[in-house]
């Protein structure tokens, strides 16, 4: 047992005189011989601070009469500490130190929290320390989840390796200077846990047996699924896997246009024919949810019947639907509403929850995640099978690329394990990295029980504090009158309602307890100006508190632009010089994530940087001082320019080019589909495509996805027509091209676009034009008739 701690929450200080303190010191010394450190806390507040921050805690000794500051409550200090243990820990061994005559007067709930009682002066120090150490060892042993426990057990056996990988527990690295450097950096334990699937004791990832299978079953229980699969290549592989399993060639798939590119890859692999569903957008350019009306059966039928690709489908009914939940900017659906709306249109529903693996573990998100849809919440034969793909590493504690697929199957679309496992193995590897499996196992264990709720609650609480702090500082600046009144804002409700009293409160003044416990405070009320989305219904969508969007002056949520503006790209360029890297930057907004790793010091540093930026802007500081690397890289463009001048020039360009307006039009008016994505991919790999300048790209068929970041959503999918030169898509891309030329160093991140080496022109991949007779034949094959199935007629839908 190593790195374990025992809390002594007792009245006596470590240096106190008296026989009781002396006996406690003897017990402490005995515990050290068992490899246990003691943290001493002499007040309830100190003890609770240790409980919040000491992750190595393995046992606690709590004095019932521990003092605490007067709070007006009836609890003793010891009672407060015990309640805190119950809220935060599952089965932590707690010994209550009290006089024997006090037992009959203790509340009944105390016996449910403690595992025993101590009278320090009535037993010897070695005996008491042995009891505590034994309980701590048992707690640590039971704390470990199935796979991680088995991996540690195997490592402790120190067996010789006669199997892959060839580095043999890291030994091979020690035979080379550079290898030795690698070994020293990562350490022997990591390298010895990099094992082969030949180690039967650890089970099989492909067969889901042994400790691996036990870990997946445990994850299914914790995440609320009937079946869970561990995936070691990220949520992108999860998306491809589920899409490849759920829909086959020439079947119809309903696809949220606000989807990740991996969803498209699944369509390419399966040969499905996509029908896109269009989300709302607001004045900031942020993508909203799919409106409820978009999911209704009549609307889906209308989109399907108008889509040329469905003319050649094997059935007019969609076999699969996929939505992003939550969105990149933190918008979460009522998943039961979504499932009920889409149930008449598809038997399989996939929620891509890459950024939302924590949702089940906090009451704010109740009913907002895929696995909330099951036989208990949606009884009856209409319920669709639900898949949830989660990038565990993004917002929980797991190694990069560690992900999970959760499944709640329904009778109308059964998911037989043997069939799904074929897709799983097709997208998996026979050489898994065992530390990644262990990290998924540990991430699951961290979320299991009250500790998981506490971890997510801390992230929510810190996000709320930051949100309120930004607004309060803005108000103080406006009230001071000694400086320009502007400051950054936060995209969030301006006021909230306390359901207990009906009182309407400014968001910045609302009690943090209300904001972290009442989901209605975060719901997008229909047609509220602060969010700028239309067509929503009550309770349909919720803003995730931990995804914080900072807003810059220049535009509001309904798209009204002001004379003064600070484009967010300039802000994030400055933040980068302060070693602050944000998650996403749009024209006038920037996204930051409050994960479990966020601390007050971390967001306090961000707040200080925002204040410094304001001061530099107000004093018209030169760019050489703020962004020296930018000026050095482009001296002819930025030398002599000030921060305020750059912001204003960029703001005027965005306004005059109507970039935000063009963005909305490009995303709302979908290009016309011409051919399935799989056909374009086949042309791509056989040299049947070419890169085309925007000026020559009118009415061409795209061969690759074009995704603009910001906002990170596809504007053009493979198989779609680019439209006219003055159409919404090419006008928008041309405006981006113009922006990049005028503001070097602030280039848009546009996937699917390359730059001409001689001119810097945008180039997009298009299907090479073919003679008319070949075009007619291709159109006939891909629009009017399904691809021939060599295995016979297709299976019945559903």
Protein language model regions, located:
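Structural motif
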Residues: 9-18, 42-44, 62-66, 97-100, ...
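Conserved acidic segment of CheY-like receiver
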Residues: 2-31, 39-40, 60, 95, ...
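Conserved N-terminal alpha-helix of the aminotransferase class I/II PLP-enzyme fold
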Residues: 189-237
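Short beta-alpha junction loops
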Residues: 12-14, 96-103, 354-363
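Non-catalytic terminal extensions of PLP-dependent enzymes
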Residues: 52-55, 102, 110-204, 221, ...
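Hydrophobic positions in alpha-helices of CheY-like receiver
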Residues: 84-85, 338, 342, 610
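Conserved phosphotransfer microenvironments
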Residues: 19-25, 44, 56-89, 98-105
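Conserved PLP-enzyme active-site core in the AAT-like
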Residues: 41-44, 49-53, 67, 237-248, ...
């Amino acid at each position: 047992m190593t790195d374990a701690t025992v809390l002594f929450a007792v009245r006596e200080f470590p240096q106190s005189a008296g026989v009781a303190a002396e006996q406690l010191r003897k017990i402490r010394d005995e515990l050290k011989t068992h490899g246990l450190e003691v943290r001493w806390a002499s007040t309830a507040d100190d003890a609770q601070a240790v409980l919040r921050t000491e992750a190595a805690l393995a046992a606690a000794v709590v004095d019932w009469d521990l003092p605490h500051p007067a709070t007006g409550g009836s609890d003793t200090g010891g009672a407060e500490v015990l309640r805190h243990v119950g809220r935060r820990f599952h089965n932590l061994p707690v010994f209550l130190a009290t006089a024997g005559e006090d037992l009959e007067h203790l509340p009944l709930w105390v016996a449910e929290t403690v595992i025993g009682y101590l009278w320090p002066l009535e037993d010897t120090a070695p005996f008491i320390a042995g009891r505590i150490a034994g309980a701590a060892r048992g707690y640590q042993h039971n704390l470990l989840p199935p796979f991680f426990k088995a991996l540690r057990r195997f490592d402790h056996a120190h067996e010789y390796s006669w199997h892959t990988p060839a580095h043999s527990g890291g030994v091979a690295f020690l035979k080379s200077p550079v290898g030795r450097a690698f070994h020293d950096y990562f350490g022997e334990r990591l390298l010895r846990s990099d094992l082969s699937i030949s180690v039967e004791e650890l089970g099989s990832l492909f067969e889901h047996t042994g400790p691996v299978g036990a870990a997946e079953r445990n994850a299914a229980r914790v995440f609320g699924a009937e079946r869970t699969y561990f995936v070691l290549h990220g949520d992108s592989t999860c998306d491809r896997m589920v899409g490849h399993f759920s829909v086959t060639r020439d079947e119809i798939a309903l696809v949220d246009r606000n989807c990740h590119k991996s969803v498209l890859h699944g369509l390419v692999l399966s040969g499905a024919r996509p029908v896109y569903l269009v989300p709302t957008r607001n004045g900031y350019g942020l993508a909203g949810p799919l409106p409820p009306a978009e999911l209704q059966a009549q609307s889906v039928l209308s989109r399907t019947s108008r889509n040329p690709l469905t003319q050649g489908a094997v059935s007019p009914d969609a076999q699969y639907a996929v939505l992003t939940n939550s969105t990149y900017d933190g918008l979460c659906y009522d998943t039961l509403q979504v499932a009920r709306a889409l149930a008449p249109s598809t038997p399989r529903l996939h929620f891509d929850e890459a950024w939302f693996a924590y949702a089940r573990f906090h009451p704010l998100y109740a009913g907002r995640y895929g696995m909330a849809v099951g036989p208990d919440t949606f009884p009856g034969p209409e319920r669709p099978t639900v898949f949830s793909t989660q990038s565990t590493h993004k917002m929980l504690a797991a190694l990069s690329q560690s992900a999970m697929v959760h499944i709640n199957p329904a009778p109308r679309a059964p998911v037989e394990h043997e069939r799904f496992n074929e897709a799983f193995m097709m997208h998996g590897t026979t050489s898994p990295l065992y530390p990644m499996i262990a990290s998924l196992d540990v991430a699951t264990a961290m979320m299991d029980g009250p500790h998981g709720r506490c971890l997510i609650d801390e992230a929510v609480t810190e996000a709320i504090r930051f949100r309120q702090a930004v607004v309060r500082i803005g108000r103080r600046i406006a009230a001071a009158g000694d400086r320009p009144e502007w400051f950054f804002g936060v995209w969030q409700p301006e006021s909230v309602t306390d359901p207990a009293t009906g009182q309407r409160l400014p968001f910045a003044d609302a009690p943090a307890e209300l904001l972290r416990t009442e989901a209605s405070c975060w719901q997008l009320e229909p047609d509220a100006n602060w969010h700028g989305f239309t067509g929503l219904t009550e309770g349909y969508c919720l803003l995730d508190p931990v995804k914080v969007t900072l807003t810059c002056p220049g535009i509001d949520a309904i798209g009204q632009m002001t004379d003064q503006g600070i484009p967010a790209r300039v802000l994030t360029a400055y933040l980068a010089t302060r070693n602050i890297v944000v998650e996403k930057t749009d024209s006038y907004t920037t996204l930051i994530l409050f994960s479990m790793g966020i601390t007050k010091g971390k967001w306090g540093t961000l707040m200080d940087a925002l204040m410094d930026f304001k001061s530099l802007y107000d004093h018209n500081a030169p760019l050489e001082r703020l962004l020296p690397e930018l000026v050095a890289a482009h001296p002819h463009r930025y030398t002599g320019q000030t921060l305020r001048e750059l912001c204003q020039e960029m703001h005027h360009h965005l306004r005059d080019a109507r970039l935000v307006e063009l963005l909305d039009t490009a995303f709302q008016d979908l290009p016309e589909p011409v051919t399935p994505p799989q056909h374009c991919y086949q042309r791509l790999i056989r040299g049947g495509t070419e890169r085309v300048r925007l000026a020559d790209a009118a009415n061409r068929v795209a061969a690759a996805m074009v995704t603009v970041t910001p906002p990170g959503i596809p504007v053009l999918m493979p198989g779609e027509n680019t439209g006219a030169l003055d159409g919404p898509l090419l006008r928008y891309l041309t405006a981006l091209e113009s922006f990049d030329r005028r503001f070097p160093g602030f280039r848009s991140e546009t996937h699917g676009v390359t730059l001409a080496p001689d001119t810097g022109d945008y180039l997009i991949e298009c299907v090479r034009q073919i003679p008319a007779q070949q075009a007619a034949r291709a159109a006939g094959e891909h629009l009017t008739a399904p691809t021939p199935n060599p295995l016979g007629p297709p299976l019945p839908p559903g």
